[in-house]
Amino acid sequence: MVGGAQPAEQSIARHIVLIVGGNNLCTGVAIAPDLVLTAAHCVLANGKYRLLAFEGRRPAVKDVASVAPHPQFSPRSDAPDLALVKLAAPPAPGLTPAAFSERRVPPSVGDRFIVAGFGVAVQGDRKTAGRLRAAVLVATDRPSSQQLSLVDPRKLGESAGLGVCNGDSGGPVFDAQDRALIGIISWSSRTDGEPVCGFVSGIIPLARYRNWIVDTAEKLGSPLAP
């Protein structure tokens, strides 16, 4: 998270996990005691994934039982970059499921959101990853039910500022008003489309895909609370 800081509220940190596998590092958010929501591109490669839940000084390491990417996801399209990760064992007691937002309409330009992830603080420097950071960003451009672009409220995407980066993918996006889960971090780029951090942060809003999330969670044996 470029320009991010440790989350001011510990309750936010208790929802979030670090996902590692092969040479990959991503973020995820618990939505049930043994189920994590993340970005599909984080878990597409063959390999063994593990989740690290941080409670106290030592992380609890959890094995992954199965992964369910959204069936329409493709790295070459704007299809939903979402996946569910089923844990082989329940997570640490300190990890709590996040509550979904009940918001059913796309955000408006200027709406504020909290993004969080374990990604790098400096693009290209993997040594700066692995620490949970958060930032407050605002909606810009044309918010829709498929994609949401967030920017630093001071820079507005015109120059580098706060924003998600490598390793933040799959991390949660919370409504700044009620702290409810409204989206998942998917990508970052400059306004010209170049993959540069600190300009535009791309988000997948969850309202459109809520039915898929609920149905898939039940198939994985982790029904979500109403």
Q: What annotation goes with each model-predicted range?
A:
Residues 1-22, 27:
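N-terminal activation segment of mature serine protease catalytic domains
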Residues 19-21, 30, 38, 53, ...:
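Hydrophobic residues in beta-strands and at strand termini
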Residues 20-21, 38-41, 46, 71, ...:
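Sec/Tat-exported extracytoplasmic proteins
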Residues 19-21, 156-157, 162-166:
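Short loop/turn motifs at secondary-structure junctions and domain boundaries
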Residues 67, 79-161, 199-200, 206-213:
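Chymotrypsin/trypsin-fold serine protease catalytic domain
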Residues 25, 32-33, 37-76, 108, ...:
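Catalytic-histidine neighborhood of serine endopeptidases
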Residues 8-12, 30-31, 44, 61, ...:
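Extracellular/periplasmic catalytic domains that process cell-envelope and extracellular macromolecules
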Residues 25, 30-43, 134-139, 169, ...:
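C-terminal subregion of chymotrypsin/trypsin-like serine protease catalytic domains
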